[in-house]
């Protein structure tokens, strides 16, 4: 028991890498002749898996779609991966680490990759605002708690 109480939390980044990237401009070149007033949609998703004892892969998927009216100007997707050594935490703390802390580390890399691809597609510069993954994680926990409550009420 005393060994468990003395276990310190350890966190180390082993590797950050681009797992998958995609850029499509399905309506080029005529989309370049239109007034550039796009509607930009940002979708985020995270996934994690345990690779070994205390070693986890976290993948942040960022998808940006820019539309002009009904036409898609571009669609850009990045899957930014990271391998992390994490020990000394469990349960909700581990879920927060994998679902919020690690994505916070990965997002700047994904954002830079998206900015580069959009620029190479000769579209105007796209600056993605920082994302509060802690707030997104808390919303996720609240949704999960709400769904659990609804299930108990139905029973």
UniProtKB/Swiss-Prot annotation:
Disruption phenotype: Growth continues, but export of its substrates is blocked. Expression of chaperones DnaK, GroEL/ES, ClpB, and HslU increases. One of its GO terms (biological process) is protein tetramerization. It is found in: Cytoplasm. Its main location: cytoplasm. CDD domains: Translocase_SecB. Keywords: Chaperone, Cytoplasm, Protein transport, Translocation, Transport. GO terms for cellular component: cytosol. Homotetramer, a dimer of dimers. One homotetramer interacts with 1 SecA dimer. This is Protein-export protein SecB. It comes from Escherichia coli (strain K12). The gene is secB.
